[in-house]
Amino acid sequence: MSQTIDKINSCYPLFEQDEYQELFRNKRQLEEAHDAQRVQEVFAWTTTAEYEALNFRREALTVDPAKACQPLGAVLCSLGFANTLPYVHGSQGCVAYFRTYFNRHFKEPIACVSDSMTEDAAVFGGNNNMNLGLQNASALYKPEIIAVSTTCMAEVIGDDLQAFIANAKKDGFVDSSIAVPHAHTPSFIGSHVTGWDNMFEGFAKTFTADYQGQPGKLPKLNLVTGFETYLGNFRVLKRMMEQMAVPCSLLSDPSEVLDTPADGHYRMYSGGTTQQEMKEAPDAIDTLLLQPWQLLKSKKVVQEMWNQPATEVAIPLGLAATDELLMTVSQLSGKPIADALTLERGRLVDMMLDSHTWLHGKKFGLYGDPDFVMGLTRFLLELGCEPTVILSHNANKRWQKAMNKMLDASPYGRDSEVFINCDLWHFRSLMFTRQPDFMIGNSYGKFIQRDTLAKGKAFEVPLIRLGFPLFDRHHLHRQTTWGYEGAMNIVTTLVNAVLEKLDSDTSQLGKTDYSFDLVR
């Protein structure tokens, strides 16, 4: 092999060398693999409308889910509270998955522990694991809050978190001064957004259940983001509220703990919503739920426990949605919209005008969580784009109906199709049969782009990376997608993807380069 200390190749150029190619050929002979022609025949068949029809008749099988499980969301919610240690009651392997998932997205260490239930706990229950786990976690990591969620193992055998935690405190395994909110988060129903919602309900019950709040006693607003992984969105919310001189509390704010500096000091806990902020939440003017399709239990808490209206707002993604949020904040707080925000809005409108000739009429397929997909679809319509294929694996029929209503109201949405309870293998079929210009989604879409390219350059559907997770590109999680600032970022991302593809399509010397222009 030609690997030397002076010339070290990574796997891509290394495995292209003759000796490795020969090794692969010899290995393939032992695998009893189908010949290349048969593989190509089957691949071509999976790109057809006939295969799509079979694909959509699947009932008991998910291939490449476009969602994750509940405890993942519960962990993210917990990370947003100050001095809080996420604690998962269940399998250690599950927690390794959650930590790895967030490690790869945020490029940060993720503090999260498990009480490592194994075979004996699966038979006799996990009470002993809970006792020892809470004792060790509090002694080793000195948290002020331990936020407990569950994996499938604990849920299948029916472990009672409330009783386990109460007994652990009574028996002295964990100090009574440590708050232990909890949520049942079974992975076999719902998704990561459900887990976030359930965990937030657990925090609300722990800190406010015994408090009779007085809405409006404090002249501030509460903002609840739901499952949100763009750290810039937390910062832009705080900036906009500060510019309007509106006091606010972001209830669950992980923007510091998931973006700590490299200065020689490890911060297991950094920033986050304090216990006092959570306790005072019922005294705020109102609580705005910024991703309402995923925050059903949170809405119930706000309206029934805190006696606040939970004034309806949509995810603040795009021009009109940000307008609506700021007007709602102004109405509730009595504060005018800041001149700086009006100026920022004007810049966004100018950008939309500058780029409309390249974005108008472009067809997009997109997938993701319900609120994100609805917000992005709305913004695409504002830009004159055509979102022809829209898929959300974890959405419901009410969401689908609301999406169709929004699409029918726009001339750019009348040819759109909305799919729910469908996975990325369904989406793959749709990319072949509908052939949009681009797809928008998380990193998993790169495999669909690769497959469309394998059919031929004319069939390629390039991926524009927006959403979660983003494993294969760096630092995108720090960006902003909400507010006018976020809309500017999205316009920039979309139009430059269009122009990159145009440059690629017109770069053949003497053949297509008559449109390989310097100015776009």
Curated annotation (Swiss-Prot):
* Cellular component, GO annotation: molybdenum-iron nitrogenase complex
Q: Which InterPro entries is this protein grouped with? A: ChlB/BchB/BchZ, Nase/OxRdtase_comp1, Nase_comp1_CS, Nase_Mo-Fe_CF_bsu, Nase_Mo-Fe_CF_bsu_N
Q: What name is this protein filed under?
A: Nitrogenase molybdenum-iron protein beta chain
Residues that bind [8Fe-7S] cluster: C69, C94, C152, S187
Q: What is its EC number?
A: 1.18.6.1
Kindly state which keywords UniProt assigns to this record, in alphabetical order.
Answer: ATP-binding, Iron, Iron-sulfur, Metal-binding, Nitrogen fixation, Nucleotide-binding, Oxidoreductase
Where does this protein come from, organism-wise? Answer: Klebsiella pneumoniae
This chain is encoded by the gene named nifK
Biological process, per Gene Ontology: nitrogen fixation
What's this protein's family per the entry? Answer: Belongs to the NifD/NifK/NifE/NifN family.
- PROSITE patterns xref list: NITROGENASE_1_1 (PS00699), NITROGENASE_1_2 (PS00090)
Describe, as the record does, how this protein assembles with itself and its partners.
Answer: Tetramer of two alpha and two beta chains. Forms complex with the iron protein (nitrogenase component 2).
Q: How is the cofactor bound?
A: Binds 1 [8Fe-7S] cluster per heterodimer.
| Job description of the protein | This molybdenum-iron protein is part of the nitrogenase complex that catalyzes the key enzymatic reactions in nitrogen fixation.
Q: Which cofactor does it need?
A: [8Fe-7S] cluster
